[in-house]
Amino acid sequence: MIHIYTDASSKDTTMYPGGVLRTTKVGIIVRNSNIIDVWFKRKEKFISSHEAEKQAILYSVAYVRSEYETNDITVHTDEKHLMQCKSIKKLIASGIRVEYVKGHCPGRKELKYKFNCLADWISRNGINTWRNYYYRHLLPQ
């Protein structure tokens, strides 16, 4: 089974000098407590956080289905309201499990993750930095 921990962040700071429009979406792909891949997308465009979270789930699942040729997937999200979306209901009907994780940052407990927003942190520091941090500090020794 593959687990996907999704997160997304939308920022509109154009009211400040040097402000940006940015949407970041990420899916951490885990098998047997090991990160096997990371799906990540950042655009210089603002969309609602609801839409960004939904896209993070849909695109991460599509990526795993094509790259790993499996439908044995559980998605972990911190957005409870997404369970009511038509596209997420279709995903569930197709056999994908979608679980709500209470609080910020799905995978925080499972991955012992200690930052508030996974997507923001990866956006600032890079995927490899996060992956190295995970393997060095967060995996049980």
Go through the PLM ranges and name each one.
Residues 9-23, 43, 58-120, 131-140:
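RNase H catalytic domain
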Residues 127:
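Residue-centric detector for conserved, function-critical "anchor" positions
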Residues 1-51, 62-63:
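RNase H-like nuclease fold core
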Residues 52, 56:
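Loop-to-helix element that buttresses phosphate recognition and phosphoryl-transfer chemistry
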